[in-house]
């Protein structure tokens, strides 16, 4: 049986911590194949080029998606997310993942989730239903609504996902993976 291809998009050092252990488990499985896609701040020198940390941890990215158009304005962010979605569409078309695994609530992860959803790639979301109290919280809830499998970190978060109308059989209270 061919291994199932699990794409993981990682965009920043903070969320990398959430998926690192899971990525090691995917790599150890004979039934799964890791397809690591690196984007966002990982690729920027001004944020420490944290892609180097990923490589030092033993991972080989299947793809890198440069996305930033420059600037930190709302317009620049919106344009950058559009660039990311175009790049991810090409990568997903090439890799043909069976599932996209994402974590957190950053805009880059929302763009990845939207792209996968429109390409009929099922999405699993680590940290569904958490609260942050800022714009990223809205992104997290949008990611949750687009995801097919929900992996909240606690029962309160799982309850929020259920209250959003998600089917209970799709919700797995797994705790925080880091």
Please describe what each predicted stretch is.
Residues 1-42:
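N-terminal subdomain of nucleotide-sugar transferases
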């Amino acid at each position: 049986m061919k291994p199932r291809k699990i794409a993981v998009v990682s965009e920043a050092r903070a969320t990398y911590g959430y998926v690192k252990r899971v990525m090691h488990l995917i790599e150890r499985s004979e039934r799964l194949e890791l397809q690591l896609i690196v984007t966002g701040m990982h690729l920027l020198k001004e944020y420490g080029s944290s892609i180097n940390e990923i490589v030092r941890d033993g991972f080989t990215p299947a793809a890198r998606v440069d996305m930033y158009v420059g600037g930190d304005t709302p317009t620049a962010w919106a344009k950058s997310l559009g660039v990311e979605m175009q790049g991810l569409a090409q990568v997903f078309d090439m890799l043909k993942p069976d599932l996209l695994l994402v974590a957190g609530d950053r805009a880059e992860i929302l763009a990845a989730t939207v792209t996968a959803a429109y390409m009929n790639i099922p999405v699993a979301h680590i940290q569904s239903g958490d609260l942050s109290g800022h714009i990223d919280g809205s992104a997290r809830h949008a990611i949750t609504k687009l995801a097919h499998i929900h992996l909240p970190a606690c029962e309160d978060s799982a309850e929020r996902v259920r209250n959003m109308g998600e089917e209970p059989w799709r919700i797995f209270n797994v705790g925080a993976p880091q």
